Amino acid sequence: EEKSDHRHFSLSSGNYKYVIETQLFFKQQENPVFYGGFLTYEYPIQENKYNYLAPPLLNLSLSATFKRFDEKDSSLGYGLGILQSGHGYWNGVKEPNSRSLSVSPTFSYLINSRFGALSFNISKPYFLKGAFNTNEGDIGQGSNIWQFTVSLRKV
């Protein structure tokens, strides 16, 4: 099977960071056909030009893909992400709302098409600790976040 180079990217907080990441994934013929996860730790080196120091982040993501063995060569994926954020700082002052802990279960459906592999994903983050978990002063605020993504991978 021929492999081609590709790039993964994400938006940044604007700080230079140390990033330590490890991944472990397995592929097999029976279900789950693909499973594993990654662990990433990000630690900011210094404040950016706006005097912002991003919080350290610890991210654990686990996933498993189950092939349906149907005529569309589709598969179902299940995942769980855990993200812990430390405190960020503006001008050396601790951000009161930057520390958090969230858990995000994910469901995905992948189907092969004439254009490539088409994936539909839905994720629901739950904030266990941090600013989105509590409502200080009962001021009628809150969050109800859903994430939807559609991706096309062409080989």
Ranges and model annotations:
Residues 1-53, 152:
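Outer-membrane pore/translocation modules
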Residues 49-155:
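Outer membrane beta-barrel transmembrane domains
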